[in-house]
Amino acid sequence: MSDDIKVLGISGSLRSGSYNSAALQEAIGLVPPGMSIELADISGIPLYNEDVYALGFPPAVERFREQIRAADALLFATPEYNYSMAGVLKNAIDWASRPPEQPFSGKPAAILGASAGRFGTARAQYHLRQTLVFLDVHPLNKPEVMISSAQNAFDAQGRLLDDKARELIQQQLQALQLWVRRLRG
């Protein structure tokens, strides 16, 4: 097994000016040596429907499942809607977790989020963590990255202006790297 750690970044927002997608872009520039981040595109994943699933996985779902299988770790960026993760993210997780095999099982993960509110996606992250634990994903506990007042933390081009948030993302990536190595044995 290679020492390089391949991380799959998954944004729970489809919005073109998404603060969460911007945070993932920022993370790409902050990865420690020996780590890389590839971004998943979940925009083509249809709403989960058992009738469609009975016919097989749609191509966008199969691509997403393959990206999960190929990754050493996962980095989720979720907005918060109504005290929870975004529906589009939950939908992608629901599709990817269907049998016969479970691509999420045993994967280390980290969660970050950005929100215009003052709690910075705290509730969404805890809800996402609960879902991931059920899927046998191993979420990193600390540091937590919850970017509040995102409209002030990012500029119009999506660059993160908040030095503390940038430092937390960098620390989280370093901790994720150590977590992956620890779980590898």
UniProtKB/Swiss-Prot annotation:
Function statement: Has NAD(P)H-dependent FMN reductase activity.
Keywords: Flavoprotein, FMN, NAD, NADP, Nucleotide-binding, Oxidoreductase
Name used for this protein in its record: NAD(P)H-dependent FMN reductase PA1204
Subunit: Homodimer.
Principal EC category: oxidoreductase
Enzyme Commission code(s) on record: 1.-.-.-
Domain of life: Bacteria
Molecular function terms from GO: FMN binding; FMN reductase (NADPH) activity; identical protein binding; NAD(P)H dehydrogenase (quinone) activity; oxidoreductase activity, acting on NAD(P)H, quinone or similar compound as acceptor; protein homodimerization activity
InterPro entries from the UniProt entry: Flavoprotein-like_sf (IPR029039), FMN_Rdtase-like_dom (IPR005025), NAD(P)H-dep_reductase (IPR050712)
Required co-factors: FMN
Chain residues that bind NAD(+): S115, A116, G117, R118, F119, G120, T121, A122
Family statement drawn from the similarity comment of this UniProt entry: Belongs to the SsuE family.
Signal peptide segment: none
Sites where the protein binds FMN: S13, L14, R15, S16, G17, S18, Y19, N20, Y81, N82, Y83
Annotated disulfide bonds: none
Native source species: Pseudomonas aeruginosa (strain ATCC 15692 / DSM 22644 / CIP 104116 / JCM 14847 / LMG 12228 / 1C / PRS 101 / PAO1)
